[in-house]
From Swiss-Prot:
It is found in: Mitochondrion intermembrane space; Mitochondrion membrane. PANTHER family: HELPER OF TIM PROTEIN 13, ZINC FINGER PROTEIN. Interacts with the small Tim proteins. Its main location: mitochondrion. Required for the assembly or recycling of the small Tim proteins in the mitochondrial intermembrane, thereby participating in the import and insertion of multi-pass transmembrane proteins into the mitochondrial inner membrane. Zn(2+) 2 binds at C67, C70, C85, C88. InterPro entries: Mito_Tim_assembly_helper, UCP017292, Znf_CHY, Znf_CHY_sf. This is Helper of Tim protein 13. The lineage of its organism: Eukaryota, Fungi, Dikarya, Ascomycota, Saccharomycotina. One of its GO terms (cellular component) is mitochondrial membrane. Zn(2+) 1 binds at C17, H19, C40, C43.
Length: 114
């Protein structure tokens, strides 16, 4: 099975980018508008400047997060339940939760970000 591609202004093969490149910055997030994984919101905006469409965090039909180390794709619930990859045990940046609204929406929020 082919591994999903991660887009962005990447600085390594583990999904770190020009904007977020600390030791724990090893995830990428799927954007609904592109149906692709981007290292961060800024990378998405700079590379594909269109209205951002977000997935609902409760959508279990499509993986929304990918581990940049082992490339495991996971649901938002699987990702947010732990601060590490369930497959390779790589640690995730706990500060990412401060930006969930840039990537995901809740049931009562609009899909698009302007």
């Amino acid at each position: 099975m082919e591994k999903a591609q991660i887009y962005g202004k990447l600085v390594d093969k583990e999904s770190r980018c020009e904007h977020w490149h600390g030791p724990l910055d090893v995830i990428a997030l799927r954007f609904k508008c592109c149906n692709g994984y981007y290292a961060c919101y800024e990378c998405h905006q700079e590379l594909v400047p269109h209205v951002t469409e977000r997935y609902n965090i409760n959508d279990e039909t499509v993986p929304l997060v990918i581990c940049g180390v082992c490339k495991l794709e996971m649901s938002f619930a699987a990702y947010s339940d732990s601060l590490q990859c369930p497959n390779c045990r790589s640690q995730f940046n706990p500060g990412c939760k401060l930006h969930y609204d840039m990537y995901f929406m809740k049931d009562d929020e609009p899909e698009n970000l302007r």
